[in-house]
């Protein structure tokens, strides 16, 4: 297929690093999009497998696929390069081990244009060899325009940048970019927070349009060595929020709770030694924020104080629990 448009309606960024296992399935699903005015920017981050050859094959058949080769510098740097390259009115991101429904970008684009959205979002499936499970985040309003700052449930979703469609001009105006720490993971955490913080018009559809693969052993979420990446992301979030000098919005009151949701999730995926290392760093961070009064603007919840107290005084108890829900259940009992 040959593109006959100068400026695409949507640019889709596909950050790739040693992605050969599922990449063809991913790119095939993109090629089948019902939206024709679309470009697919594949950023090859120094892959050492057949990733580049697979992308080149798709490019020969369909010049809407664009290959960018670069030395390995990480996920965030790859996506920033994609953002700088994209010509589309809106920008989407698809991970190379996921795949999408044929009408995903047509539906999100139509929704974004109709309601003049900064961010349009879809529900999605958790995908594994056993099948698909719908993930619709019931606490988030569907098919209605909201301001995320006035609807905190938007922030409580997983980062999942790949379920969103972003207005390109809005991204550029707000100078939204990913952290570029080489070798890091979860660099969508701070980006997603900043995007929702800056957005004034957000809408989520209840249509599940993307299949998020949860059983890829190569996924960074399973990398036990990347213990502290979420801390770097949350340092970026705190720096961003305090730079805005905003003190009177509900989100500020919830900031610590949102942080601890992320930390508890990270704790749950680590092995025993990783838990000990992470809790120690969490402890040091809590002491730093108290000492420097970086949390003086936050009306911290009781749950926050309980969690912080456990980190300070009884981390061994916290290490017994691997799942966020189990931890929260225990803490609520202690609070009563």
Where are these regions (language model features)?
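A conserved acidic beta->alpha catalytic loop
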Residues: 44-53, 73, 95
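Donor-binding/catalytic cores of nucleotide-activated saccharide
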Residues: 75, 79, 96-203, 210-227
């Amino acid at each position: 297929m040959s593109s006959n448009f100068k400026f695409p309606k949507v640019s889709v960024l596909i950050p790739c690093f040693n992605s050969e296992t599922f990449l063809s399935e991913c790119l095939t699903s993109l090629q089948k999009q019902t939206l024709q005015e679309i470009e697919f920017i594949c950023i090859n981050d120094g892959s050492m497998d057949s990733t580049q050859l697979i992308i080149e094959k798709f490019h020969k058949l369909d010049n809407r696929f664009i290959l960018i080769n670069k030395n390995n510098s990480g996920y965030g740097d790859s996506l920033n390069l994609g953002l700088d390259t994209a010509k589309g009115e809106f920008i989407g991101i698809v991970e190379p081990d996921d795949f999408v429904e044929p009408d995903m970008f047509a539906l999100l684009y139509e929704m974004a244009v109709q309601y003049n959205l900064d961010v349009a979002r879809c529900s999605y499936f958790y995908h594994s060899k056993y099948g698909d499970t719908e993930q619709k985040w019931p606490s988030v309003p569907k098919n209605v325009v909201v301001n995320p700052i006035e609807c905190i449930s938007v922030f409580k979703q997983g980062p999942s940048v790949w379920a969103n469609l972003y207005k390109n001009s809005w991204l550029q105006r707000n100078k939204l970019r990913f952290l570029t720490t080489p070798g890091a993971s979860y660099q969508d955490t701070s980006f997603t927070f900043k995007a929702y913080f800056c957005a004034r018009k957000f809408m989520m559809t209840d249509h599940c349009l993307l299949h998020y693969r949860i059983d890829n052993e190569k996924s960074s979420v399973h990398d036990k060595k990347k213990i502290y990446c979420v801390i770097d992301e949350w340092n970026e979030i705190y720096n961003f929020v305090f730079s805005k000098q905003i003190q009177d919005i509900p989100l500020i009151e919830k900031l610590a709770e949102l942080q601890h949701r992320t930390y508890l999730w990270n704790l749950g995926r680590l092995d025993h030694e990783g838990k000990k290392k992470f809790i120690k760093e969490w402890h040091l961070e809590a002491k730093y924020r108290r000492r420097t009064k970086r949390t003086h603007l936050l009306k911290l919840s009781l749950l926050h104080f309980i969690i912080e107290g456990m980190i300070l005084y009884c981390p061994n108890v916290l290490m017994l629990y691997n799942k966020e829900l189990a931890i929260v259940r225990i803490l609520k009992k202690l609070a009563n």
